[in-house]
Amino acid sequence: MLKNDLFLKALKGETVQRPPVWMMRQAGRYLPEFIELRDKYDFFTRCQTPELAAEITVQPIRRIAPDAAILFSDILVVPQAMGIEVLMKENIGPFIPNPIRSMADVQRVYVPDIQESLGYVMDAIKLTKEMLNDEVPLIGFAGSPWTIFCYAVEGRGSKSFDMAKGFCFSNPVAAHTLLQKITDTTILYLKEKVKAGVDAVQIFDSWGGMLSPVDYQEFSWKYINQIVEALADLTPVIVFGKGCWFALGEMGKSRASALGVDWTCSARNARYLSGGNITLQGNFDPSRLLSPIPTIKKMVHEMIDEFGKDKYVVNLGHGILPNIPVDHAKAFIDAVKEYGQ
């Protein structure tokens, strides 16, 4: 039995004393103990070594004590498993030496055997669950098919992802074939994560906001919703679309347990657009953690007042930044725990 199930209660829409809190990228570069391991091991070694991934996952639980842990991994382990080479380059970030630019390229990409290619993730989950000792729930995650597609076609991060969008518009059959392969792989991957022991999953649609509302339905939401439908009976599913406020209405009608919101959408608008019945997660501007601690606490309390304490998970509107002082991150978590006291 979980000692702290506040997060799962909020996902079910149950009444709570206070909302739960965790932070995207909470196992990250703002923690000195994370930096120590980063300096010793390269990025994918940390992802692919269960002992390292588990240790990194529990670091923030010890240090700042959020109400949920999120497995340390990366969305790009999925395309790696599908036969796409992915490197992590200094000062560039994700880099794909042979991006996908044709139907022939798409046909070389395959839906893998998950245990064979991503078994190390399942081992990390089992190890993390042991280390957490039922203190808090564990979240597993995956990138949205569109977000994975963006990297696979563009070959690296981009301000506009015009190659990826251009591929959709000029070669829609190939684009949809690739998106479906990514979707099928992601469903199998998340199902294995649930079997391995995660308590909830989150889909990160980091680049969904690059698309117009019409294109979003065709190239992103259609595929995310397949994942939601496939997982909803097995585990709570959170969908986080950065910059996707325009899709909250459609998302709110889905079987997702919660929707993540970024800081460009007010609590009032998010509640209104999503239909008012679904749990929302967010949406503190990560840069605001650079504010003085009393300001952070005041703003967090105001944010909870705006969203309401029920059907709400306190989080940032995107991942925590590397330059945030640890005591500021802790103040964010503490502010939620002090709410209403």
Curated annotation (Swiss-Prot):
> GO biological process: any one?
protoporphyrinogen IX biosynthetic process
Residues engaged in binding substrate: 25-29, 44, 74, 151, 206, 318
| PROSITE patterns named in the record | UROD_1, UROD_2
Keyword set includes rRNA-binding: no
Task: Tell me the domain of life.
Answer: Bacteria
InterPro entries in UniProt: UROD/MetE-like_sf (IPR038071), Uroporphyrinogen_deCO2ase_HemE (IPR006361), Uroporphyrinogen_deCOase (IPR000257)
Catalysed reactions, as listed in the record? uroporphyrinogen III + 4 H(+) = coproporphyrinogen III + 4 CO2
Record site: Transition state stabilizer: 74
* Major localization class: cytoplasm
Keyword annotations of the record:
Cytoplasm, Decarboxylase, Lyase, Porphyrin biosynthesis
Under the GO molecular function aspect, what terms does this record hold?
uroporphyrinogen decarboxylase activity
- What EC number(s) does this enzyme carry? 4.1.1.37
> Per the record, what is one GO cellular component?
cytosol
How would you summarize the oligomeric state and partners of this protein?
A: Homodimer.
Please explain the role this protein plays, according to its UniProt record. Catalyzes the decarboxylation of four acetate groups of uroporphyrinogen-III to yield coproporphyrinogen-III.
Q: Which family does it belong to?
A: Belongs to the uroporphyrinogen decarboxylase family.
Protein name, as recorded: Uroporphyrinogen decarboxylase
